[in-house]
């Protein structure tokens, strides 16, 4: 799980950045020191998330409830609209939306009738707000509705079966019964952490920071 070279001294023709890449450690992740700053990174297993392109209505409703959508009709409207966005027909579900709804928006557009290519695309779907998707921003108003967000628990990849070893507690609670969740967590606790996993998709989020500066940039 660790891909590193024995030498930390640049060979002929190598730059400091190239050596830093060679010292990449997927398990014991630390800042990568460069000449003019540092790079930090996080790695998430996409197989430990819920696929937005294959989730059924019950799973979507649980995701929305977790984020903070308390009203059942609102949850049903969003989940039906997500399913309508993906399916190939022009017929909307009971509380869903198709072209007849989106053509009335400003500016007007069409339902995709195809799979999501990015998670941000959810913002085009009827009822989905930035707060529901990303979570509420810090607010001084205690009475303002707060949302947890679901973006970190979603993937666009086709995941036949979620990997329970890398799924978050939130994803486990959404996909499994409480008894199963307790069993999974107990097994993980007793067997310890294993650095290798047989997953197909990973998402790496790097953040660069300029030395002696508060400037950061995340890709």
Label for each model-derived stretch:
Residues 1-219:
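Compositionally biased linear targeting/interaction segments
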